[in-house]
């Protein structure tokens, strides 16, 4: 298994604390904008409730009587006051309750996530994060660290990926709208692309390797 060196950020320090070897297949996948677009659309489609609904001509309330006789009035023929051209008439081809989701193969989703991580690594915006004090952090501590670290840019969005759900870090980051915390099993293409920097907890790298490469 070949690997690449990824910079390590120590939580609390203001510069790189060294580097760590990460599986090359995880962070050097080919750039596939077509798959990134497909998987992002797939994620967003699944979130849609699909509960929007309009009434058609057969569903709106009103009389079924023909408004006036077919011939002899000089007006255009009409068969129902519930037709779409009338006020309070039914809607033609309006939205109906449905599922917007569609299926994407697991291998495609895996390649898209590796492509997104590789994109951030190629940009120099993917780091491994030392995790010894992550669970003890406060919002003020996070804010101070992001502002003082030379490798990170102020005013950008940050995605922190931990090994498993970290309640302490989630509470701290909830007060910072530009920081999002996920865990290895929930890391996804949309959030990697949405955020400018990706910080992987050391233990989360193994979770991602097992999830995406096995």
UniProtKB/Swiss-Prot annotation:
Region (Disordered): 53-79
The keyword RNA-binding is assigned to this record: yes
GO biological process: translation
Gene Ontology cellular component list: ribonucleoprotein complex; ribosome
Keywords recorded for this protein, A-Z: Ribonucleoprotein, Ribosomal protein, RNA-binding, rRNA-binding
GO molecular function per UniProt: rRNA binding; structural constituent of ribosome
Pfam annotation, one family: Ribosomal_L4
Family assignment from sequence similarity: Belongs to the universal ribosomal protein uL4 family.
Oligomer status and interactors: Part of the 50S ribosomal subunit.
Record function comment: One of the primary rRNA binding proteins, this protein initially binds near the 5'-end of the 23S rRNA. It is important during the early stages of 50S assembly. It makes multiple contacts with different domains of the 23S rRNA in the assembled 50S subunit and ribosome. Forms part of the polypeptide exit tunnel.
Alphabetical list of PANTHER family matching this protein: 50S RIBOSOMAL PROTEIN L4 (PTHR10746), LARGE RIBOSOMAL SUBUNIT PROTEIN UL4M (PTHR10746:SF6)
HAMAP family (alphabetical): Ribosomal_uL4_B
Protein name as annotated: Large ribosomal subunit protein uL4
Protein's organism: Neorickettsia sennetsu (strain ATCC VR-367 / Miyayama) (Ehrlichia sennetsu)
Gene behind this protein: rplD
């Amino acid at each position: 298994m070949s690997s690449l060196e990824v910079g390590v950020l120590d939580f609390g320090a203001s510069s790189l604390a060294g580097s760590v070897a990460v599986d090359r297949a995880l962070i050097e996948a080919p750039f596939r904008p077509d798959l990134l677009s497909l998987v992002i659309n797939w994620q967003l489609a699944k979130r849609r409730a699909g509960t929007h609904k309009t009434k058609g001509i057969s569903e709106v309330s009103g009389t079924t009587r023909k408004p006036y006789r077919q011939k002899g009035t000089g007006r255009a023929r009409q068969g129902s006051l519930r037709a779409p051209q009338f006020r309070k008439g039914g809607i033609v081809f309006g939205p109906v309750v449905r599922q917007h989701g569609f299926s994407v193969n697991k291998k495609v989703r895996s390649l898209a996530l590796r492509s997104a991580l590789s994109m951030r690594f190629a940009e120099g915006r993917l780091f491994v994060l030392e995790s010894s004090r992550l669970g003890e952090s406060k919002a003020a501590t996070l804010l101070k660290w992001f502002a003082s670290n030379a490798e990170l840019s102020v005013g950008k969005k940050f995605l922190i990926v931990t090994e498993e759900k970290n309640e302490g870090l989630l509470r701290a980051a909830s007060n910072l709208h530009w920081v999002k915390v996920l865990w290895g099993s929930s890391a996804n293409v949309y959030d990697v692309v949405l955020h400018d920097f990706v910080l992987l907890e050391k233990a989360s790298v193994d979770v991602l390797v097992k999830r995406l490469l096995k």
